[in-house]
Amino acid sequence: MLDLIQTRRDLHQIPEIGLEEFKTQAYLLDVIEKLTTGKDFVQIRTWRTGILVYLQGSQPERTIGWRTDIDGLPIVEQTGLPFASQHQGRMHACGHDFHMTIALGCLERALEEQPKNNLLFLFQPAEENEAGGMLMYEDDAFGDWLPDQFYGLHVRPDLKVGQIATNTHTLFAGTCEVKIRFKGKGGHAAFPHEANDALVAASYFVTQVQSVVSRNVNPIEGAVVTFGVFQAGTTNNVITDTAFLHGTIRALTQDMSLLVQKRVKTVAEGVAAAFDMEVEVELKQGGYLPVENNPALARELMDFFDEKDGIELIDIEPAMTGEDFGYLLSKVDGVMFWLGIDSPYALHHPQMSPKEEVLAIGVAAVSSFLKKKAAE
């Protein structure tokens, strides 16, 4: 039987950036091959650093998919754990080591007997940086294994062990990266009339763009426009010719995201025109679409977990964090949910350390749900 805690600790020590998960893939394949030995209803494919494990059903009417992400983050770990990251500047700070371990545990249980329906276990690379789910879909990595329904989870530090949370609508926001560069004319600080100050123009933009959310977004729907980087100038007595802004747009529907993207671009171009300078606007959303649960499937999943002993089901509000599972759910009906890990530190924090008793709870809950779906 798979040692869940040791498996998680092994994976925790080898975090890798998206599409560079070579050691992770090798470790996963080794475990998967041991679990599937002698199971003639199993097929395995790889796609770059990703893995697909397909269980052929005995009387299939549909394919049920379970997706887990496998990449780490460029973070220096500060947990002090004896099994801390062995890769300098890399850490599983988003719980993907937990996600992988739970998926392996569920695979082990699913292999106990051939399912009626097909089951697909997807070990997806590059959730954090390149929207690996979108890359796999666009490259036809699924082929005829593409699920009819897709499910997945994400750990959540502020939920207690034993708590599962989701809803029948949107769970995660769609996210869009924004880069804006104003190009004016540099000059001496004493002669501003001979220059065209990009810093001033960019400052006007930062204040004016706040009106996009307050005046263009339905307050019931909500959206976020945040700029976390503002770079301009090199010294106190020189007017800079360029100013660079780097930020993010987040919205709970794709229509709202597109509206906000359009308005941010329009405001930037309007400010540039007012200051008689050039502007470059780069909007990059890629595969980070809103994670929109299928209402009927979500209700089914919620009812199932609500009746499970040891599980506290929570009907939760959407989060403005992003997840590339949204792209796959835009192609295939499915559901994502949160799994509580009771950590005082947030996701992406260098001291984030989930409670390991969650592993057995997660495997028991998810595997029982997948067995139900596979038997329908």
Curated annotation (Swiss-Prot):
Biological processes per GO annotation: diaminopimelate biosynthetic process; lysine biosynthetic process via diaminopimelate
Active-site residues from the entry: D69, E128 (proton acceptor)
The protein's annotated pathway: Amino-acid biosynthesis; L-lysine biosynthesis via DAP pathway; LL-2,6-diaminopimelate from (S)-tetrahydrodipicolinate (acetylase route): step 3/3
Keyword annotations of the record: Amino-acid biosynthesis, Diaminopimelate biosynthesis, Hydrolase, Lysine biosynthesis
Superkingdom, taxonomy of origin: Bacteria
InterPro entries the record matches: AcetylDAP_deacetylase, Amidohydrolase, Bact_exopeptidase_dim_dom, Peptidase_M20, Peptidase_M20_dimer
Enzyme nomenclature, EC number: 3.5.1.47
Segment forming the signal sequence: none
Reactions the enzyme catalyzes: N-acetyl-(2S,6S)-2,6-diaminopimelate + H2O = (2S,6S)-2,6-diaminopimelate + acetate
GO molecular function: N-acetyldiaminopimelate deacetylase activity
Function as written in the Swiss-Prot or TrEMBL entry: Catalyzes the conversion of N-acetyl-diaminopimelate to diaminopimelate and acetate.
Family indicated by similarity: Belongs to the peptidase M20A family. N-acetyldiaminopimelate deacetylase subfamily.
Protein name (Swiss-Prot/TrEMBL): N-acetyldiaminopimelate deacetylase
Organism: Streptococcus pneumoniae serotype 2 (strain D39 / NCTC 7466)
